[in-house]
Amino acid sequence: PAELEKIKALATEQDVDQSVIKLMNIRGYANVRNMCIYTAYILGAEMAMLIDDDELFEKEDFVDLASQYIGGRLYGKTIDGVAGYYLNKYGNYYDDVDIEPWMTYWDRFGFKGKAFDKIIGQEPRIKLTPFAFGGAMIIHRNLFKTVPFDPNVTRGEDIDYLINAKMFGFHFFLDRELSIKHLPPKK
């Protein structure tokens, strides 16, 4: 909270509209992510790297990997965002869930696993992606200065951001080398 007040003071010094400053808070995932991209913006950074507090860097070159393609071009499109992906405690990208009887009828984790196999598990290394993970997103300045996270979205802010970016003509790619260990707390 003290750091947030400093950011608000800096925004006021830069004549940021008070209606925008009122939006600055750290309640909910979307607002926390907005504070991350806003901080990158006011610091003049070319990219924002969004990482969560329950993740571990296992690759020493993670930052180099994350910044390797951002802002470039591939397949005739700008690389405005790069999505990494989570590895669970077992070192794979599948959701670590206990199978419940209802999953027989609504196999969302099975379908998700198939999508991950297709996007994460296959070449090429960099490809356009239909999904992103909020705790493993790299966002170029051209994108984050135009598209914020929707503060009214309480969950799924990462996919919502991807959709909004696409609506504004920006492109998100997934880098199959950009993995990070995700160790969420026990519920």
Regions from the PLM with identified roles:
Residues 142-145:
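Short, well-ordered alpha-helical scaffold segment located
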